[in-house]
From Swiss-Prot:
Record text on cofactor binding: Binds 1 Mg(2+) or Mn(2+) ion per subunit.
Protein's name in the database: Phosphoribosylamine--glycine ligase
Key words, A-Z: ATP-binding, Ligase, Magnesium, Manganese, Metal-binding, Nucleotide-binding, Purine biosynthesis
Family to which the UniProt record says this protein belongs: Belongs to the GARS family.
Biological processes annotated in GO: 'de novo' IMP biosynthetic process; purine nucleobase biosynthetic process
PANTHER family hit by this protein: PHOSPHORIBOSYLAMINE--GLYCINE LIGASE, PHOSPHORIBOSYLAMINE--GLYCINE LIGASE, CHLOROPLASTIC
Keyword Nucleotide-binding: yes
Gene3D superfamilies (UniProt xref): 3.40.50.20, ATP-grasp fold, A domain, ATP-grasp fold, B domain, Phosphoribosylglycinamide synthetase, C-terminal domain
Pathway the protein acts in: Purine metabolism; IMP biosynthesis via de novo pathway; N(1)-(5-phospho-D-ribosyl)glycinamide from 5-phospho-alpha-D-ribose 1-diphosphate: step 2/2
Cofactor(s) in the UniProt record: Mg(2+); Mn(2+)
Binding residues for ATP: 135-196
């Protein structure tokens, strides 16, 4: 069996690594992939960009690809799933219409309101003056979001009115995020603990994946600007069984039903970014129409079921006939980033200390890497994700940092506290 994975990040490396464990799979093509996927057993990189949909379709037809899994959001929002389905090619992901849940924050907030799904109070703006008037009326802290895709960086949590006004000016007048910021969503600041709740959806049935928690801020103790994610762990202890049941009942099920009722039947991975308050009540912060990055890395370390079988069941509309099995241990992924990220950073730095053989329960997933000759060099802001399993979150953290500390390049940095909330919970018991 031949499988195609679209993307080049740590998420796609983790998906490829997992798919390779299926004995029926002969070759996994990753378009365009990275240095890590190139070195993986059964995996080949293909030099096709993630938004070159005609080339992706032609390649899948040429290689008789039996399953395509889409990693990032950009190809989904421009209709890669629609194009593959039109060509009769099996693909797991949402259609262009369904991917609006991530592609437009204003669409999402209006959808949540229509279906009484809990979320922060908000308003949408395309003009500066009404937006400024709204934040002055509401006061800080307040959240300002670019409407479109901004690689996870289009969200400003403004702790002062000045920060909120600057963000609105930047997005609506300064064009800080291009067309993604030509409309902004301003919403109330939510208190609580965040969790990533990822499920597989076949249009009707839902199969929950393991819970996780992402660390968005660049600095220790959640300081500094937002990033695409500096690390993650699974499971997220904030999601107790009660919270899990509430999320399914109050958020996931009405979302899947609502999308179907509106003619945008949802298939694919659905990721709800949630804020859980002190009473265990969830509110939706955002939806992503794909697996999170870096959450995929620790989640795939824990997944014991066959990912190919789960995706095929979903494509066939039979998710109610399968179940997912999980390693009971905790897993942590620590992102190793290029100096300057999430701002400007250098590329082409030579990476040393990468592990030469696999050790059980530890894995370095590649993201912004490429090979030059026999060297692996940096090629992005988030470069690697050192991931490990442990009997406790603390043990998983220690093993992940043990792996991370062997690796070096000029300017490398990482957060030193990934998993701190879960570790504090463990130690309080």
């Amino acid at each position: 069996m031949q499988v195609l994975i679209i993307g080049s990040g740590g998420r796609e490396h983790a998906l490829a690594w997992k798919v390779a464990q299926n004995p029926q799979v002969d070759t996994i093509y990753v378009a365009p992939g990275n240095a890590g996927t190139a070195l993986e057993h059964k995996v080949q990189n293909v030099n096709i960009g993630i938004t070159d949909i005609p080339a992706l379709v032609a390649f899948a037809q040429d290689k008789a690809i039996e399953l395509t899994i889409v990693g990032p959001e950009a190809p989904l929002v421009i209709g890669v799933v629609d194009a593959f389905r039109a060509a009769g090619l099996p693909i797991f992901g949402p259609t262009q219409g369904a991917a609006q849940l991530e592609g437009s924050k204003a669409f999402t907030k209006d959808f949540l309101a229509r279906h009484n799904i809990p979320t922060a109070a908000y308003a949408n703006f395309t003009e500066i003056e009404p937006a400024l008037a709204y934040v002055r009326e509401k006061g800080a802290p307040i959240v300002v979001k670019a409407d479109g895709l901004a690689a996870g960086k289009g969200v400003i949590v403004a702790m002062t009115l000045q920060e909120a006004e600057d963000a609105i000016q930047d997005m609506l007048a300064g064009n800080a995020f291009g067309s993604a910021g030509s409309r902004v969503v301003v919403e109330e600041f939510l208190d609580g603990e965040e969790a990533s709740f990822i499920v597989m959806v076949d249009g009707e049935n839902v199969l929950p994946m393991a819970t996780s928690q992402d660390h968005k801020r660049v600095g220790d103790a959640d300081t500094g600007p937002n990033t695409g994610g500096m690390g993650a762990y699974s499971p997220a202890p904030v999601v107790t069984q009660d919270v899990h049941d509430r999320v399914m009942r109050e958020v996931i099920d009405p979302t899947v039903r609502g999308m179907a009722a509106e003619g945008n039947t949802y298939t694919g991975f659905l990721y709800a970014g949630l804020m859980i308050d002190s009473t265990g009540a969830p509110k939706v912060i955002e939806y992503n129409c794909r697996f999170g990055d870096p959450e995929t890395q620790p989640i795939m370390m824990r997944l014991q079921s066959d990912l190919v079988e789960l995706c095929q069941a979903a494509i066939a509309g039979k998710l109610d006939q399968v179940e997912s099995k999980w390693d009971p241990r905790a897993s942590i992924g620590v992102v190793l980033a290029a100096g300057g990220y999430p701002g400007d950073y250098a590329k082409g730095e030579v990476i040393s200390g990468l592990p030469t053989q696999e050790s059980a329960g530890q894995k370095v997933f590649h993201a912004g890497t490429e090979t030059q000759g026999d060297q692996v060099v940096t090629n992005g802001g988030r470069v690697l994700c050192a991931t490990a399993l442990g009997n406790t979150v603390l043990e998983a953290q220690q093993r992940a940092y043990q792996l991370a500390d062997q690796i070096h390049w000029n300017g490398m940095f990482c957060r030193r506290d990934i998993g701190y909330r879960a570790i504090a919970r463990e130690q309080a018991k």
